[in-house]
Amino acid sequence: MKLTQDQQDLLDGKFGEGAKLAMKVQVAIGESFGAERMVPITRAHVALSNQDADRWLAEKLAGLGAKCRVRPTVNPGFCLSYFKKMGVVTNKDYEEMERTDRAYRALGAELSYNCTPYMDTNVPLFGEICAFSESSATPYVNSIWGARSNREGANSALFASITGYVPEYGLLLDENRHGNILVQVEADIKCDADYHILGMCGKKIGHGIPVFAGLPKNITKEALRNLGAELNTSGSYDMYHIPGFTPEAPDIKTAFGGKEPERVVTITNDDLAEVLESISLPGHQPIDFAMLKCTLFTGHPVRRVHFAL
């Protein structure tokens, strides 16, 4: 890889051992993907977790003196003061979360504790190069905002935040952002939740960048988040297009880069029913409780739940 002087200085340890470690791993990632250079980022999001390995790395980097050049937002943890007061977590859980919080503060992260920052607090501009981890984030920033991010892991996004660079490959390159699968949606898509089920059809859609035709004209931001999150978890999709809706697909021809789709897939009501059946309890058993993930909720679904209760 061809490195600039600043990048080489990072690799040589002139900015400290923490930044050196981060750059060393990033160069290795770039070489494994055939990247020719590193490019600067302006935004980042780290899928922070409180698990041992992730916390160990954050503490190690902080201990080596690493500081984030690009201040990242982070995924959810729990509110230390509130949960301690309520007494709903064990002392061990509290202490581990406190360590995670302390490590990311030392690194200079923005402790937003929100896994959907791309919808409000960390919104990239069209064409902006970013490093976003979190399964729902990468499809959203690429597809809906037209920004550019590869599917970063929590650790690689943290390394990018520290160095301020990412290797240039994959979805950072124009030629890799065109669709190659036409998905004809003949199923009835009636509400935001249906986009969850549509996204879980990844096994039938197959690997690539899908271009969806036949969707309703008015799609909420929550529905788009649902679609991208399930596409990424069901089939590792980093991007999709909706002609006439997403910024890089003003029409279907542009969505495919002027080429014909490699394959055409049709999604019917039967496909949605099959997916729904696969994630349901056998025999349609009653559920014991429902957990509403507030970090994924925006104002609209919160209001719906409020009025339903």
Task: Label every model-predicted segment.
Residues 1-308:
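Non-transmembrane, aqueous-exposed alpha-helical and coiled segments at domain scale
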